[in-house]
Amino acid sequence: MTMKKVDLRSDTVTLPTPAMREAMLKAPLGDDVFGDDPTVLALQDRIAELTGKEAALFMPTGTQSNLCGLMAHCQRGDEYLVGQHAHTYRYEGGGAAVLGSIQPQPLTQDAHGLISLTDLALAIKPDDAHFARTSLLALENTWNGKRMPMSYLQQASQLAREHGLAVHLDGARVMNAAVDQAANNGTDPLAELRQITSLFDSVSVCFSKGLGAPVGSALCGPRALIQKAHRARKMLGGGMRQSGLLAAAALYALNHHVARLAQDHVLAQRLATGLQGIPGLSVRSADTNIVFVDVAHGKGAALLAHLQQEHVLATGMIGLRFVTHLDVDAAGIDHAVASVRRFFQSDANGASTAQLHGGPY
């Protein structure tokens, strides 16, 4: 019997559920470039409502959502402040600089992804022709699976606005942040979502990660900003025709898969707990659905290869990253833990040619 694969590389690997596929097949369609695909319009209205914004724009990818947002906020030659390990700066191909002529100013982040308020204030350039004009602060929530504290988001966004900066949120996994915040506060996840997004002028939300849709992201913000982003999307090749097929999956996910993200968080904690105490491992458990593991003595590649042989997939660069999602269950997590334990119990854990993938995705 073939063992079921436990794919913990990313929450992007999920497949559409049968109900989601049915919603896609039944979706009314039009031509979204002409603006008359009813399912795309319904999705845009729904995510704008959930985030408390005037409008939203459906995009193929989160990278494009972030880039269109930056290009809508900034003029050519402007600068945006961003964490040195933030996705928009490190993992999106340098698009802001290459395609938007926007200069990033990367700033040091602590172990929780926070940029100190002092560093933020000092990085804002004076109004002088020698400097790029600092016009935007970009934050990310969640960051490496960690939820940004509301107190920090409030202080950072207030500081930015006091200096005339707009504030953008890379909210690829903001639904995870909202669900975790709701669990801590005993409140509704969608109410927490609006609390988070209310602090930002714009927010990108990914549908193809924990929510489980096959494709898509949305940029949400003021109507005038979304109109600028629409022009940028066209220029970047993001206009799609009968994209209601994809929007239907995202709309289904918004209506059915938000609350269930809590199950992914429970599985991540189950994984972290199971890996605790293994000699040679240092577990950095997160608030939500991502667990990082540092592997001692340079054995990360060998561990990755061992896991692949046992039908467990992960990614790694410095240590390994495991991401839980709707296609993983408790049995799969327990198998992953047992596989890691077998590796460290074995003497055959030497060098390996397994490729370490750079992530995060």
What name fits each language-model region?
Residues T2-H297, A301-V328, A336-Y361:
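Conserved PLP-enzyme active-site core in the AAT-like
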